[in-house]
């Protein structure tokens, strides 16, 4: 498990399978064979936490439907696991349409250690509509009070609109054999519901060529499964999906007056909608290529999230890290011996930001048995203080009993900012 991971991780990212939490999937949630892969991943993280090597930041990505999947039980299970391991947690729902002509809403759950100072500009006091939609707010309100107490609303700046439309990513010069026949296109139109036919008629009468998308959606009926051709004509592509899901391959719809033509989206067009560079080497087969797109996260979304939130948080977690990598290597041996050890003068840091104080601060590392570490962290969470402050208060009481003054804090280690 975690023994094969060296040192302390600044950031851990997991995009666990969405098949069982997606609208297009089986909806069995984190109990499902695919999406349940979260739990083996989490077992590794828990081992790192117990070894004193908790990752500074944890980022989890999945489809937006995770918020309500499995009767609404999956989201609190994930958030509760993070909080139980000593993290504060927040989440954002980001649509790739903010960056690309591609509607792709994904939830990003971001957690950071309880003791880490968070820059004020990375937080907002109240949820914002752009990234904290109503279903997320309701799910947070329904969390147990002890878990909700550790919730954060992350601040993410909105990007500048790119202005790119679906027509801008369409490949020209598609050979005649790449288009559907008139009969195939007529069959798709016949599977549109009245609302989609209205959209099609609007494109026909717009007076200019229009490009839209169709995706085939299957529904279970009493008398069998029915298929519908869902249309989008607003210059943004519908979400690219796995080609073997209940919602099938993406189809492009071209309308110019009474002329209506359809064809499958090309791999190059799909890559552009995911924000991949033209030089990106794609698989050789259609299904393998769109399998990548269906499983993937839009590139500019991750880049924006990393630059504006994840990297600043990782820097903060790294600066707070209480031990050196060399000291971490001793943790496993201490756990085997069953000892509690205090190693002084592991690191020293010059005092720069406290007027009137000169010299250096001395860092110490406390090694605890896993069960004791867990017990103390839970107590710290209940008291709404950092683990450091919890231990320091115990030291203050012993000093007071011996007629000595409490320990002077070089930096605030009480309730962490943003907690």
Name the predicted role of every residue range.
Residues 2-11, 19, 23-232:
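Class I S-adenosyl-L-methionine
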Residues 400-419:
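Short, positively charged interaction helices/loops
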């Amino acid at each position: 498990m975690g023994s094969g991971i060296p040192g302390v991780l600044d950031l851990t990212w997991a995009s666990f399978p969405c098949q069982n939490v997606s609208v297009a999937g089986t909806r069995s949630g984190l109990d499902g064979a695919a999406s349940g892969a979260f739990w083996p991943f989490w077992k590794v993280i828990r081992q790192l936490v117990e070894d004193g090597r908790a990752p500074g930041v944890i980022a989890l990505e999945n489809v937006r439907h995770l918020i309500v999947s499995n009767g609404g039980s999956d989201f609190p299970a994930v958030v509760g696991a993070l909080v139980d391991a000593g993290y504060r947690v927040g989440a954002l729902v980001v649509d790739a349409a903010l960056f690309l002509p591609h509607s792709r809403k994904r939830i990003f759950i971001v957690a950071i250690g309880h003791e880490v100072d968070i820059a004020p500009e990375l937080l907002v006091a109240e949820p914002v509509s752009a990234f904290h939609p109503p279903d997320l707010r309701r799910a947070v309100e329904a969390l147990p009070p002890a878990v909700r107490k550790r919730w954060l609303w992350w601040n993410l700046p909105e990007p500048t609109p790119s202005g790119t439309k679906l027509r801008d990513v369409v490949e020209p010069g598609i050979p005649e054999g790449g288009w559907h026949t008139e009969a195939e296109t007529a069959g798709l139109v016949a599977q549109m519901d009245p609302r989609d036919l209205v959209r099609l008629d609007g494109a026909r009468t717009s007076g200019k060529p229009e490009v839209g998308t169709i995706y085939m959606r299957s529904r279970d009926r009493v008398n069998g499964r029915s298929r519908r051709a869902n249309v989008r004509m607003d210059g943004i592509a519908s979400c690219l999906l796995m080609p073997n899901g209940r919602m099938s391959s993406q189809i492009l719809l071209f309308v110019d007056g009474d002329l209506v033509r359809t064809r499958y989206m090309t791999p190059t067009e799909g890559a552009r909608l995911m924000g991949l560079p033209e030089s990106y080497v794609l698989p050789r087969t259609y299904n393998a290529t769109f399998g990548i797109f269906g499983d993937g996260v839009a590139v500019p979304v991750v880049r924006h999230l990393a630059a504006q939130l994840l990297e600043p948080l990782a820097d903060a977690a790294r600066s707070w890290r209480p031990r050196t990598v060399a000291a971490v290597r001793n943790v496993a041996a201490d756990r085997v011996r069953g000892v509690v050890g205090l190693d002084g003068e592991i690191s020293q840091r010059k005092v720069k930001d406290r007027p009137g104080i000169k010299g250096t601060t001395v860092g110490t590392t406390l090694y605890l048995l896993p069960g004791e570490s867990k017990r103390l962290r839970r107590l710290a969470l209940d008291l709404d203080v950092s683990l450091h402050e919890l231990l320091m208060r115990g030291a203050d009481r012993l000093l007071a009993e011996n007629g000595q003054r409490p320990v002077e804090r070089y930096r605030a280690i009480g309730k962490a900012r943003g907690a």
